[in-house]
Every structure is written in C-alpha cells, then in structure tokens.
Amino acid sequence: MSHQAKYATAVGLLVLLNGCANMADSGSNVTASDPKKATRTGFLSNYAKMEKAPGGDGALCWRQPGLDLKAYNQVMISRMVVTLKDEQIKGVDPADLKALTDYFYKSLVTALKPQMEIVDKPGAGVVVLRIALTDLVPTSVGRSAMGTLIPYGFVAEAGSGVAAGGPAGSTPYLGQTGMEIQFLDGATEAILAECIDTQIGRKYAADVESGASGATSTWISGYMNSFQSWSYARNAFDKWSKQIAKRFAELRGISPQAK
C-alpha cells in the first residue's frame, strides 16, 4: 500500500472514530494526576501539610485531625474562582469558561445530591466548598490529529508523555486542568480540609484493571477526547466530583448513593 493510500485510510479512520466520539463513556481514567504541575496560587491556607490523598490518583490533601463529617448533611458549592495565568486567559473564550464552570457545578451536584442536600446558604451542618480553577489549557486538536495521521506517528507520541515526565498515555499538547478546593464549616468558617490537583489528558489510556472490554472502552474514550478542545477538562471535573462524593461518604460512614 502506498503512503498516499495509508494516509487516506488513516484520515478515513479518524473521521469514522470522531463520529463515534459521543458514544464513548467519559471515564475517570482518561485523565491522570500530575502533582508536579499543580499550581499553588495562595487560595489555600497551608500547602506544606498536604499529602497524597487516599483513594485519589495523585491529588494532595490535608484534613483537620479527627474530622467527623457525620455532623454534616448539607453542602453549599460557592461561586467558583478562576485564577489562570495570563497566557492561559488569552487562550480561553469567556463563553467556554462559563460553560466549563457551569459544567463543574452540575457535576458536583450530580455526585453529591444522592447523599447530601444541596443548599445555597451556609449554616450549621453545612459543608461549604470553595473552588479555584488554577489551570485550564485546551487540547491542541490540530496537533492531536497530525500525530494520528502521520504514518507510525502514534507510536512515537504514545510514549512522549512519560518521556517528558508526565503521566503514561499523555502527550505534550493534551489538555490540562487544575484546581484548588477548600472545605469549610458553614457555621464557623473553620477549615475542615483542603486539596490541590492538576489533571492531564491521556490520549492513550487503558484501564487494565477493568478487564479487556473496560480497557478497550477507556482507550477509545481517551483517544476520542484528544480531538475535542475541552473534553479532558470535563472528564477532570467529573473525576473530582466522584472522588469528593466518595470521600464524603467514607468519612460520614454511609453509601455515596444514600442520604
């Protein structure tokens, strides 16, 4: 087969797969934590005390010693703060930014609502979530497509993330999303916990622990997300929302699906 034919075949395959993008699950494994890239903006009170959080894939957290969340049955999600670097602000359309913060809010509500009442005012028994988006870099869709269409290009780029010191399956042009989050007592404003994390998109992701079908689904999802500017950001938001809900349930001694 000639190089031209191979190129045409690759283009056709990309178009076919891209048409199936909406059929792939978002999945929590299409992004991975990269603590080295976590941005410390001063939004949180003490970064030095943070350690790798249990149940997370790299997020750094601190929580008040002896914290008992059983006394809390409501949660308030404060208006999100956006503290991006100048070069990142220039690359984000204001309409996209609003859509992304709205998406994150709805994702948190979806994850937390089964176990806690969502309220809009602080008070006794309320955990207040303060969130700052600190990194927001869209995927360079053009570079992702070129890495796929160049014959054998995907072989080299599949290992480029690790070579550059990033997560396995990532490449230098994929989306990056960072946040800092603070959990406050709604009555006293005492800091209950704090976390920081940055998630990097994984174009070549595989969840090998979920079996062959799960690994294939994750690979397809990660691959297809690399052709959409903000898909990895939405995946990161969903991942954080589920992790927060899971940790809340563990500390409250209940199921994440029960109030």
Annotated model-derived regions:
Residues 67-132:
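N-terminal segment of the mature soluble domain
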Residues 82, 105-117, 138, 201, ...:
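Sec-exported extracytoplasmic/periplasmic mature domains
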Residues 88-100, 152-164, 207-226:
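A solvent-exposed, charged loop/short amphipathic helix patch at secondary-structure junctions
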Residues 114-116, 121-188, 214-217:
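Surface-exposed short loop/turn segments
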Residues 1-9:
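Bacterial N-terminal signal peptides that target proteins for export
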Residues 21-31, 44-63, 171-259:
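C-terminal/domain-edge helix-coil "capping" segments
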